[in-house]
A protein has these predicted regions:
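Active-site pocket-lining/capping segments in soluble small-molecule metabolic enzymes
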Residues: 1-195
Length: 195
């Protein structure tokens, strides 16, 4: 199947006569029951809840998914994409290296932002400097009753990935109180939502 990150990709699949299943990522906003219904009509295999909704706003989305018989997952760990740039930072600053790598840039507050370059298509994804983590929120997550939980690894080392997986498995699978292997993180919009 394909992971759809922009609704226009569905039309591309039709034009190219691609008959794979389509799953919709968090960037294809399933903000309400109408959006969930539309995604179901588009033959979605599953959806990923948007990063931007808080726990109260997610409740009707997951309820709509259950009514539609559409599996839905919730991202419980990962660095949220803050921006996708249409130009490559490396190419602009020092010329194209044709080598995918992790870059860093500073924002106006001095925070270091990780930047992934995607050489095949000459664009960058600027990530949140802190990972979103719902570790410690198992009760709130279970109330939402998503069909799946997603952990998104981007810049973590193998060792860091293993430690994060172990901490989330302890809390969400075994029901244990486990300390997360990181000290700096954000809850994202889970507690506050979009203004």
């Amino acid at each position: 199947g394909l992971l759809i990150r922009a609704f226009e990709e569905i039309q591309w699949m039709r034009e190219e006569q691609i008959s794979l299943s389509a799953s919709f990522d968090a960037s294809v906003y399933a903000w309400n029951h109408g959006a969930v219904h539309t995604l179901k009509e588009e033959q979605a295999a599953f959806i990923t809840a948007p990063w931007e909704l808080n726990s109260r706003e997610l409740e009707p989305v997951f309820e709509a998914c259950r009514r539609e018989g559409l599996p839905a997952e919730l991202i419980v760990y990962g660095r949220a994409p803050m921006m996708v740039s249409a130009q490559c930072i490396t190419k602009t600053v020092k010329g194209c290296s044709k080598c995918p790598s992790l870059l860093w840039m500073k924002d106006r507050t001095g925070a270091r932002l990780p930047v992934q370059n995607h050489c095949a298509f000459c664009y960058n994804t600027i990530l949140n400097p802190l990972p979103v983590s719902l570790h410690g929120c198992a009760d709130s997550v279970k109330r939402l009753a998503p069909e799946g939980l997603r952990l998104c690894f981007t810049i973590e080392t193998g060792e860091e990935t293993k430690a994060v997986l172990n901490a989330f498995a302890a809390e969400f699978i075994r029901g244990e109180n486990a300390e997360p292997p990181f000290t700096e993180f954000t809850r994202g919009h889970f507690r506050r939502g979009v203004e």
